[in-house]
A protein has these predicted regions:
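Ribonuclease/tRNase effector modules and their secretory precursors
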Residues: 1-103
Length: 103
């Protein structure tokens, strides 16, 4: 299982990578790298995806620099992490806590 402290350590040690595709999606969604960093620093893991390939990943919820809830999907590659995607959670898809998916 991935833990938030490990993801925070990756950030503190410049071991987090963002693909060009993910960076383009952030721009489209109005998300800045500093928002993602803040979300990781303030966040908690809300879902684990241990079977993801090629590396396990997780969904965390934290706050942007403007204190907006932000979801970030990150991998744990053993010695680094990759940002897979980030988005502002949609209240139509998430319960009011923004941590629980609606069914």
């Amino acid at each position: 299982m991935i833990d938030i402290e490990r993801l925070q350590w990756y950030y503190d040690n410049d071991r987090v990578f963002i693909t060009a595709h993910a960076a383009e999606r952030f721009r489209q969604r109005g998300i800045k790298v500093k928002d993602i960093r803040n979300a990781v620093k303030t966040g908690e893991i809300i879902e684990q995806y241990p079977e993801d390939y090629p590396y396990p990943s997780c969904l965390l919820m934290g706050l942007s620099v403007k204190a907006q809830p932000l979801h970030v999907v990150m991998s744990d590659e053993g010695n680094a992490s990759r940002i897979i995607t980030a988005y502002f959670p949609d209240v139509d898809k998430w319960e009011s806590d923004l941590k629980t998916r609606k069914v």
